[in-house]
Amino acid sequence: VTLSVTTDGKAPALSAAICDALVPALADCEMLCTCICTLRNTWKKTIPEQRRRAQLLRQITASDALALFREQGQTAYLQYAAKLSGIVPQEKTAILTVSFGTAYAETREQTIGAVERAIGKAFPEADVYRAFTSSRIVCRMRQNGTQVDTVNEALERLKQLGYTQIFCQPTYVAAGKEYEQLCTDAAKWKRSFLHLSVGVPLLMHTADYPHLIQTMAESGIIAHEAHRAYLLMGHGTAHAGTLAYPVFEDWLRHCGYDNVFVGTLGGVPTLEMALAQLKKHAYTEVVLSPMLLAAGKHVQRDMAGEHPASWKSILEQNGYSVTVQTQGLGAYPAIQERYVAHLRELMASQNFPETK
C-alpha cells in the first residue's frame, strides 16, 4: 500500500498531520494483507474445492473478521481463520545471521561460517541466511565476485521467498552502533512478516559475562598464570555499547583472572590503558588474542602486524615477549554454542523445534 498526500504547498503541516494519522493504519493494512496472502496460499495447497476457498476468503475479509484483527491483532485473527478452515497455516521460517563481516574468505568460513553451521545444526527446520552490516566489506566482496546481502537486502529477499517467520541473530561481541542499526532496520520490516525478532550479541545480559569467561578459559584463550599476562583486543566504538569491555574486565577480576586484560581499537579501555595496567605487575610475557568474531584486517594488521604501530610491536617496544593468537572467537566451538544459546532463548517463545 502506498500513500501520497499533498496540499500543493498550501498547508504542509496538514499533509504531515494526515500522514501521521494514516501511516499506522496503512501499516496494519500491510500486515493484514500478509496474513490473508499466507492463508490463501495455504488453502490453495490443502483445500481442492475452489468454492470452499472463496467462501473462506469472504469470511476472513468480512467486517467482523477485520474488526477482530484491528482490536486483537494477528494472532487472534489467524486463530479465527484456523477455526473456520480447520487448517493451521504452515509457517516458513528463516534465521538471518547478521555480522559485521570480513573480506578474508578463509577466515570468513572458519568463523562466521562456523557459527552459521552450528546454528543450522541446532535448528534444522529453519533455513539459515547471511547478512553483513559493513558496507565497505559488502562492496569489496562484490567487486571480488562474492555476493552477500545487507540486512535490508536480505529481509527483502526473505519476503520475496515467502518466509513468514524471521529470527535475526547478530554475531557481534557487544551491542554497539552496528547492533543499534540492525534493530532499527529490522523494526522497519516487522509488518512484512508474521513474526520478526532480533537476538542479542555475545555480551548483553549479566549472565553473559561469566559464561563467556568460562568459555574462553575452556577454549584455551585465557588461563590463570603467575608470570604470563593475556591481552584481549576488542573492537570498541564511541557507542555506549563499548562499556561492555570494561565491564568484562571487571568480571575477569571477579572470576580471579588478575592476569587477563582488555583493550579496544576504538573505545575503552584503550591499548594505553591496558599497558598501564600491565606495568603495575612483573609480567615479562604477554599472549595477545583477538576478542573479535573473525580474525580479519584488524587482527592481521592492527594486532599482529610487523609495522611499529601494531599492538604486537608496541608491546615488544615496552619490553614484553609476545605470543600472538590470531584465531577469531567464531572459530571456537564453545563460542559458537554461546550464539546458539542466545538464539535458542529468542526462539523459545515461538516453540520452535531444535536438535540438541
Where are these regions (language model features)?
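Active-site-proximal alpha-helix that buttresses catalytic centers in soluble enzyme cores
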Residues: L84-K356
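An accessory alpha-helical subdomain
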Residues: T7-A82
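Rossmann-fold NAD(P)-binding glycine/threonine-rich loop
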Residues: V1-V5
